[in-house]
Every structure is written in C-alpha cells, then in structure tokens.
Amino acid sequence: MFTMKKSLLLIFFLGTINLSLCEEERNAEEEKRDGDDEMDVEVQKRFLGPIIKMATGILPTAICKGLKKC
C-alpha cells in the first residue's frame, strides 16, 4: 500500500510539473505573438507618418498646377 501511495504521489507530482511547463511555454508563445503585432503597428505608424506629410505638401501644388489656377 505504501509503495502504491508513493507511485501515485510521484505521478501526480510529475503531472503537475508537466502542466506548469506547458502553461509557461504557451504563455511565452502568446507573448511572442503579441510582440509581433505591436511591432507591426509600430512599423505602420513609422511608415504612414512621412507619407502623409509628403502627401500634404505635394497634393495642394498638384491640384493647383492641374487646374492651372496658381
């Protein structure tokens, strides 16, 4: 009976460790995926800012020259 309790305790202990390791790995993967999304948004912000500034500078002159009312 004592050896059976020992083996059951060992199985329970190893199962608990296995579950905690899987949970840590899953959390790390989620953080990795979340970090990529944040990086994509940051790159988009960096990319769109200068383009919008250029468009606001070029667009009025293009319209003016296109309509020939300058």
UniProtKB/Swiss-Prot annotation:
Pfam families: FSAP_sig_propep
InterPro entries, A to Z: Frog_antimicrobial_propeptide
Cell location: Secreted
Keywords on record: Amphibian defense peptide, Antibiotic, Antimicrobial, Cleavage on pair of basic residues, Fungicide, Secreted, Signal
Tissue: Expressed by the skin glands.
Propeptide section residues: 23-44
Protein's UniProt keywords contain Signal: yes
GO BP of this protein: antimicrobial humoral immune response mediated by antimicrobial peptide; defense response to fungus; defense response to Gram-negative bacterium; defense response to Gram-positive bacterium; killing of cells of another organism
Tagged with keyword Nucleotide-binding: no
One Gene Ontology term, aspect cellular component: extracellular region
UniProt signal peptide: 1-22
Protein's job: Has antimicrobial activity against Gram-positive bacteria S.aureus ATCC 2592 (MIC=2.5 uM), S.aureus ATCC 43300 (MIC=2.5 uM) and B.subtilis (MIC=20.0 uM), against Gram-negative bacteria E.coli ML-35P (MIC=50.0 uM), P.aeruginosa PA01 (MIC=10.0 uM) and P.aeruginosa ATCC 27853 (MIC=5.0 uM) and against fungus C.albicans ATCC 2002 (MIC=5.0 uM).
Family: Belongs to the frog skin active peptide (FSAP) family. Brevinin subfamily.
Full protein name: Gaegurin-LK2
Natural source organism: Limnonectes kuhlii (Kuhl's Creek frog)
